[in-house]
Amino acid sequence: MARQTQSEQLDRIVAGILVRPGTLVRPANNSVAALVRVALELRGLPRPDFKAGLRADLERRTTMATALGRAVNPIREGFHSITPYLILAGAPQWIEFAKQAFGAEERFRVQRPEGGPIMHAEVKIGDSIIELADANPQFPPSMAAMSLRVSDVDAVYDRAIEAGATPIHPPADQDYGCRDASVKDMCGNHWYIFTPLSANSIFEAWRSLTPYLHPLRAPQVIEFAKKAFGAEEVYRAQSPDGVVHHAQVRIGDSIVGMGEAHGPYQPMPCTLHLYVPDADATYERALRAGATSIQPVADQPYGDRSGGVQDPFGNRWFIATHMRDVAPQ
């Protein structure tokens, strides 16, 4: 009998595997044996986990296509691409402070019975919304910095101090085209209150609320935001020694400001609610850019599909796509 080539041996063994899947075959040649192991693995595909993942992905794509076909806005009504989210020790007291200091309007609250912790609340300040909740073991209290655009810096500064805030610096005209002041609220959050002094101010396009970061190194944060969220850098003021004193990036329809940590302005990792057209794709991009998962993407009872990540600098991003309108409960 003529000796079979390696190719002929492999063809014969693969044919046997297909006809009799349970057959144990021991080829004489080691190189053929390695290929047979691959053939045995492939014979078992698609595995159940592969099928389940494929089905879930197809269902998600179908749901999103249906939502897009109905012209559902991927951003929930009243929100922008980015909405700050405060995790507080004493959320009810903070809401009262925001009403007195900033003229805030409470839109929505989910609170445990008998004056228990606030699980979620939404407050409107000017043209923007800020979300908040009482801290819990999973999400302890954290402090954030926020720019607050107003029509009268001095009046808002005075009201904030009267409501219990601590001054950081009093109102003053600045050479970058603003009159500004800053305070710290009772929860430790910084508020940079400002009014543009001219139409050419670099802050002219800012809304009532804009999150402000104080990273140790701003360029790394900017590059992460570009890779993860498609951010566009729109402004950078950098000194000859490389310190970034102020920068702005645009994500969707929103701005995130930042200036590198110095003096009393130290890193304050924040929580941001980010609306995007495809939460799953953005979540995966963020992980590839270096973020770690907090919560996998899933459909939520309030009509969003969302998940969460933490970037390499400690900021938490809850990434969402609005899928359907749900009446508040």
Please report, for each region that a protein language model flagged, where it lies by residue.
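Charged, compositionally biased N-terminal leader segments and the immediate start
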Residues: M1-P21
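Short alpha-helical interface segments
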Residues: V14-P46, L58-G69
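N-terminal beta-strand motif that seeds the catalytic metal site of vicinal oxygen chelate
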Residues: T66-E96, R107-F108, M143-M146, F194-E223, ...
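Conserved acetyl-CoA-binding loop of GNAT-fold acetyltransferases
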Residues: Q100-R107, A165-T166, K227-V234, G290-T292
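Conserved short beta-strand elements that form part of the metal-binding/catalytic scaffold
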Residues: F108-P141, H190-T195, V234-P267, R316-T321
